[in-house]
A protein has these predicted regions:
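Mobile, glycine-rich extracellular loop/lid and propeptide segments
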Residues: 1-254, 270-296, 300-310
Length: 310
């Protein structure tokens, strides 16, 4: 690999969140980078790049925070966590979390122009803490609403419900799909017995925290990292049809390097060590690849999900 171009924001933040997530519009040759600290999207042109040089790119900032707060007086911006472009390049969606960690988020939906500019088409309310946004197709947008207990579990703290929001991009409507269907004593026990990690005395609808989504054949595969699981969402039915354990790693068989006292990589096996795989990120593709992120693919008529584990 050789670098042919780059963009420098000129900004720095000890907490991160500057130029964190990037989406590329193949139809217009523009990239959009998320700056969650400022609520800005930076539009960067990728036209006229050559393999012979190292071009310093320029960017144009788009004030997503200001646009959304001006149009939706009930929303107080907290963070912009994700951005995605529709397959045909006509739409862009940005996921925004509320300032209040127990309040619903928003998905801002824009029309894309060939000059890189964006036109706000509408704002859709999502579940709590949308952490990732993805287009299932040109007309359907999904957000993974993580619902983390950001102030712990003490008195007065809230543990928000995790969910996935299904958005109709044309009608600008959203349906928040949660995990209430797994809250019965019988179904919760079945999840635990299958290897899914749940907090004691907590309902799955409260404890599960969607983080990332891969889409294939009308279904969304949703990583639940802390629960060591992947949930399957039927998009037509708008309901979760199953939650499946990612299993456990046997490090008496699989070598691992857990010694961080030096910079060397020296994996070895441990006779009595087991690990939780904790699936994290995902993206849909028809090709077989491995290692970060999760992938959805078709093989001999069956859908396969490939998930790298931390």
């Amino acid at each position: 690999l050789s670098k042919i171009a780059g963009y420098t924001s000129g900004q720095y933040n000890v907490d991160g969140g500057v130029m964190e997530i990037i989406a590329y519009n193949t139809a217009t040759d523009w990239a959009y980078a998320v700056n969650g600290q400022t609520g800005m999207l930076t539009a960067i042109s990728m036209e006229n790049l050559t393999a012979n040089g190292s071009l310093e790119l320029t960017g144009t900032e788009i004030d997503v925070k200001g646009l959304v707060e001006n149009q939706d007086a009930t929303f107080s911006y907290g963070d912009m966590t994700s951005v995605a472009v529709s397959p045909d390049g006509t739409l862009l969606a940005a996921a925004l979390q509320s300032e209040g960690y127990n309040d619903s988020g928003r998905a801002a939906i824009f029309g894309c122009s060939s000059d890189g500019s964006l036109t706000l088409r509408g704002i859709v309310e999502t579940g709590i803490q949308p952490d990732m946004v993805v287009f299932a197709d040109n007309g359907t947008i999904l957000t993974a609403d993580e619902g983390e207990p950001r102030e712990g579990y003490g008195n007065g703290a809230a543990d928000p419900r995790g969910s996935v929001t299904i958005i109709n991009a044309e009608e600008l409507t959203g349906t928040v799909v949660g995990f209430d269907g797994f809250d019965s004593e019988e179904k919760r026990a079945a999840l635990v017995s299958s290897g899914i990690i749940l907090k004691k005395n907590t309902a799955p609808s409260v404890d599960l925290e969607p983080e990332y989504i891969a889409v294939s054949d009308g279904k969304a595969y949703v990583t639940l990292q802390e629960a060591n699981a992947i949930a399957v969402l039927n998009l037509a039915d708008q309901a979760f049809e199953g939650i499946y354990s990612a299993g456990f790693e046997d490090y008496s068989v699989s070598p691992v390097d857990i010694d961080k006292k030096d910079d060397a990589y020296a994996p070895k096996t441990y006779g009595s060590l087991r690990g939780i795989r904790m699936p994290r990120r995902g993206r849909s593709t028809e090709r077989l690849i491995s290692r970060q992120p999760m992938k959805g693919m078709d093989a001999n008529g069956a859908t396969r999900i490939l998930e790298p584990f931390i």
